Amino acid sequence: QRQMCIRDRRYTLIEALPYDRPNTSMADFPLCPECKSEYVSADDRRFHAEPVACPSCGPQLSFVDGRRDTTVAGDSALSAALARLRSGAVVAVKGIGGYHLMCDACDVAAVTLLRQRKFRPDKPLAVMFPLAGDDGLEVVRQYAEPDTAEAELLTSPARPIVLTSKTPRCDLADNIAAGLSEIGAFLPYSPLHQLLLEGFGGPLVATSANISGEPVLTNNDDVESRLGNVADAFLHHDRPIVRPADDPVFRRIASSTRPLRIGRGCAPLELELPWTLPAPVLAAGGHMKGTVALAWDDRVVVSPHIGEMDSPRSLKVFEQVARDLQALYGVTAQTLVRDAHTGYTTHRWAGAQGLPVEDVWHHQAHASAVVAEADLPGQWLVFAWDGVGLGEDGTLWGGEALAGAPGAWRRVASFRPFRLPGGERAGREPWRSAAALHWTSERPWGDCPDNDGLAE
C-alpha cells in the first residue's frame, strides 16, 4: 500500500501519508459541489480520486511573455503559448515533476536558439510527440521506428523518454541529435501536455528546464528568474510541485529494455534485496547523476534522478529527497553509505550527519550493482568502464577489471596510470585523457581544441 501511495506521479504532489487530498498539493484547491459529489460517492469512478478537479475548482493556467512583458490567464494562456511556439520561440512549460523548455522540433533555428541559450551545443534533445492513431504512436512512426518493446514502453503509464531508431525519412531538425541514428521520443504525460501537443499539431523539443547539471526547476518564480535569458515565455499552472522528478530515460540494450535514468512516473523505484538488513541504511550516492537509496529489511527504494552535486540547489534538493524518503516510508536510517572520494559533496554531507558512515569505492560499487541486477551467485569478473572515481590506492581510476564478489573485489587489470590534465574535467572532455596518453607513450598526437591552454 505504501508503494501504491508514493510511486509514480503522486510522488511530486504528496506531502505526507496517508495519500489523502489534504496531504497533497491539491489541498489548496477546495472541491466545487459537483466534484465533491463525485469524490464522496462510492459508486463513482472518481471516489476518493485525490487530484480530482474541474476548470472551476482546479489549478489554473497563466502565460507570461517574458520578452513582451505581458501576462495572460485562463483558457487564453494555452493559445498564447501555442502562438509563441509557432513563431519559433522557446517556451518553458510546467509539468508534473518540473518544467520543460519546449520549441518546434522541426525548426532548426528554434533548436539552435535553445542550444545557444542553454549552453548545450551537442547533447541530444528529447522530443515529445502528439498522441494519434489507435495505439497513440501514429505521429511517432513518422519520425522513428520503435520496436514492440519500445512501443509498449512509450505508451506505458510512466511515459518515459525512449531511445529509438530514426526513420530514413525523419525530418526533425537535424541539430536535435546530430550524427546519431536514434531519437529520444516520448508522449504527453499530463492533460496540459496533451492539449499543447494536440493544438500544436506536431512534435516539440522538450528538454529539462534547469541550469546545466542541476535538478529540474519546479517553482514559477524560480524558473522566470533563473531561465529568463533562456525562455522567451512561460506557461505556468498554480499547483505546487512538492518535489522535482525529471523525465525517466530508457533504451534497448541487447534483448532487454534498460533504464538509463529513473524519474517521473517510475520512481521511487522499489527493489527486493536477497538478504535482510539488520538496520536501515541510506546511501548518498556519488557526485554526478546523483540519486538517494533507502534500504531496510529486505527492500531498497531508489529516488528519482537528482543531478550533479555541484551547486547549493542540488544539495538542497538532495537533502529534501533524503529526508522525504525516510518520512514517506516511515523509516529512519541508522547508517549512511557514501562514495569514498573526500571531495564529493555527498561524502562531506554524510560525514556531518552524526551517524555511522561506511565508505564504498566508486568502481566496486558499479561492479556490485551489476551483480545485484544479474542476481547470480558465485565469483565474477566485471569490467567497470566508468568515468573517474577514487581508487583504493589514492589515484583516480577509470576503466577497471574487478574480480570477486560484492564486498570482496580485487583489481586484476587496469590502464597504466597517467597524469590527468584538468583533473575530473577529463570525465566530460575525453580528449584530455587521449592527449595525456599520447604524451605518456611519447607518440605523436593531434591538435588540441582551439583556444585551450592545455597545449601550452
Language-model features: locations:
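Internal gly/pro-rich beta-alpha loop/helix module
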Residues: 19-26, 38-42, 198-275
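Short cysteine-rich clusters marking metal-coordination/redox-active sites
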Residues: 32-35, 54
